[in-house]
Regions:
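Secondary-structure boundary elements
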Residues: 109-111, 117-192, 200, 208, ...
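Glycine-centered loop/turn motifs
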Residues: 98, 138, 152, 228-229
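Structural beta-strand/beta-sheet cores of well-ordered domains, especially the beta-sheet scaffolds
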Residues: 22, 28, 43, 60, ...
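Structured loops at beta-to-helix junctions and adjacent beta-edge loops in soluble globular domains
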Residues: 48-50, 65, 98-100, 242, ...
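Hydrophobic/aromatic-rich core segments of domains that either
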Residues: 11, 16, 164, 196-286
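Short intrinsically disordered coil segments
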Residues: 45-47, 62, 110-120, 253-256, ...
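Ser/Thr-centric signal marking residues that sit
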Residues: 30, 177, 252
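Intrinsically disordered, low-complexity N-terminal segments that are enriched in acidic
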Residues: 1-113
Length: 298
């Protein structure tokens, strides 16, 4: 999905969700089919939303077919992980995660920081400052980012400029990139999906010394969700950046994340929070399938 960036200024000026709590049910179905069957598979699912100060998980469950041994734990980044193993021959693996969450937009009461203030948090948030190949900006973007930083009085002002720059350049177009595509490759293509837009945004922020992290989750596609109506939702990605507090922004849609966004995982990039990852034993090929259904309950 894409929106229209509404000029310059503070990110808080851009659209966010309503102040009323919204309750959403998310049903995420994913898995693999195996052309010649699999003898066994070992997997991790990151499909359970997090409870935070802005989001409460009321109910959640993860179901695996064929029936599998499983355990739940939290990884280094605080994400809920369901690890499971299937030790019998199977032609397909299906994972269904169903969750009900209630959320409100994140309220930031802390004053924005100055450029000089970033040094004080560089050690604490050093992992979110790394310019690895996944997020490193394209070489052609360097001069633009240098000019933007030089003209920005504060990190927050620079961040707003980055959001507009990335949103204007990267067209949302599925099929142009792959899960392994880097931010620089997507930038050169001029198009990609939410993962690519988030990675490009992270790289531009980190290059200026602003801690920034990748966020994965779900998005209800309607600006005004109808209570009781089930719609095709989206696995989605956005960013959070440090400006006195962690502030979120969805650069694909040019909005501040609100009550239509359901947060599942945070990390340095997509590689820290893939919905489903694992290994399997088969002589043939496999094919991934995914569907997301979202229902507003109230």
């Amino acid at each position: 999905m894409q929106g229209q960036v509404q000029g310059q200024g503070s990110a808080s000026q851009w659209q966010s969700g309503s102040p009323r709590p919204m309750q959403l049910r998310v049903r995420h179905t994913t898995g693999f089919t195996y052309a010649e069957g699999a003898e066994a598979s070992y997997n991790e699912a990151r499909m359970t939303p997090l409870t935070t100060s802005d989001q409460v998980v009321l109910r959640s469950r993860v179901e695996v077919s064929p029936t599998a041994w499983s355990q739940e734990y939290r990884d280094y980044w605080g994400t809920v992980v369901t690890a499971f193993e299937v030790h019998e021959p199977h032609d397909a693996l299906t994972v269904v995660a169903t969750s009900t969450v209630e959320s409100t937009p994140h309220a930031v009461d802390v004053a924005p920081v100055e450029w000089a203030d970033l040094a004080a948090v560089a050690d604490e948030w050093c992992e979110f400052l790394v310019l690895d190949p996944w997020v490193r900006p394209h070489d052609d973007l360097g001069a633009q980012l240098d000019a933007l930083q030089a003209s920005s009085d504060t990190p927050g002002e620079y961040a707003v400029g980055v959001f507009g720059l990335v949103h204007d350049h990267l067209r949302y177009l599925p099929g142009v990139t792959q899960v392994s595509t880097t931010a620089a490759e997507a930038w050169e293509a001029g198009a990609g999906v939410c993962q690519d837009v988030a990675h490009a945004t992270l790289g531009a922020l980190r290059r200026a010394g602003i801690p920034a992290r990748y966020v994965s989750g779900y998005l209800h596609p309607s600006a005004e969700p109808v209570v009781g109506e089930t719609v095709e939702g989206e696995s989605h990605a956005w960013v959070e950046y440090w400006d006195g507090d962690w502030r979120g922004f969805d650069p694909t849609n040019a909005v501040v994340p609100g009550d239509r966004h359901v947060l599942v995982a945070r990390g340095r990039g997509y590689g820290d929070c893939p919905p489903l990852r694992g290994i399997y034993s088969t002589p043939g090929a496999s094919e991934l399938f995914v569907s997301v259904e979202v229902t507003r309950l109230r």
